[in-house]
Amino acid sequence: MGQKINPIGFRLGINRTWDSRWFADNAEYGQLLHEDLKMRKFVMSELKQAGISKVVIERPHKKCRVTIHSARPGLIIGRKGADIDKLRKKLSEMTNSETHLNIVEVRKPEVDATLVAQSIAQQLERRVAFRRAMKRAVQSAMRLGAEGIKITCAGRLGGAEIARTEWYREGRVPLHTLRADIDYGTAEAETAFGICGIKVWIFKGEILEHDPMASERRAMEGDAQGPASRDRDRDRDRRRDNA
């Protein structure tokens, strides 16, 4: 099952949490869900060049709080905050409520699965060889502390007549291990020969505590440790648990 299911959905409530964090009764649940989908689609299309990793939506009482995780926050904020004010007004019109907008910088985009997939898609659209784009992404992720990465590209790769799937993997990607912190992202490249799909899995280490916010907290802190130091931390935690 771990090979087929979405790794993020598989770990919800264990070491991952939801991107929409609100409660509603049956009468308005559908409306709020469609608002979330509409806002995410708008942000991803409007800020395509800003490197959007994810959009987190929270709904306190009669308000809406939108947190955008971006590799280039300067493009969203704009000069003297002009662009972010326009974006806030548009989101407020969509929700018909007071909307607060937060921008969080993704410090290491090379180990963010969604941003890696988007980067490969952009390279394929510029006619970069798919093997070169995949290999470059794998090397960058491993150099910056990932313990394993797997990338698949599917479609008419290189303009071939018959569509096929190519993949590249380095290190460990334990999809069955629930305590594994695995990030997953997808993107589509609109090439002259048709659409190519990109999927990326990145293994960032293990999370031993049962904390749905652990993965997000680690990502926001930058997780500057390398694999060796993470192994030492894991061994220390296990010794402490056994003591």
Swiss-Prot record:
**Which residues fall in a compositionally biased region of kind Basic and acidic residues?**
229-243
What cellular-component terms does GO give this entry?
cytosolic small ribosomal subunit
What's an example of a GO molecular-function annotation for this chain?
rRNA binding
Q: Which Pfam families match?
A: KH_2 (PF07650), Ribosomal_S3_C (PF00189)
Can the keyword Ribonucleoprotein be found in this entry's annotation?
Answer: yes
Q: Which Gene3D superfamilies match?
A: 3.30.300.20, Ribosomal protein S3, C-terminal domain
PROSITE patterns with a match to the protein in the record: KH_TYPE_2, RIBOSOMAL_S3
Looking at the record, the residues that make up the KH type-2 domain are: 39-107
Q: Where is this region: Disordered?
A: 214-243
What's any GO biological process attached to this entry? translation
Check the UniProt entry and state the signal peptide residues, or none: none
Q: What are the UniProt keywords, alphabetically?
A: Ribonucleoprotein, Ribosomal protein, RNA-binding, rRNA-binding
Domain of life of the source: Bacteria
UniProt entry tagged with the keyword Ligase: no
Family of this protein: Belongs to the universal ribosomal protein uS3 family.
Q: What does this protein do?
A: Binds the lower part of the 30S subunit head. Binds mRNA in the 70S ribosome, positioning it for translation.
Q: What subunit structure does UniProt give? A: Part of the 30S ribosomal subunit. Forms a tight complex with proteins S10 and S14.
Protein name as catalogued? Small ribosomal subunit protein uS3
Lineage of this protein's species?
Bacteria, Pseudomonadati, Pseudomonadota, Alphaproteobacteria, Hyphomicrobiales
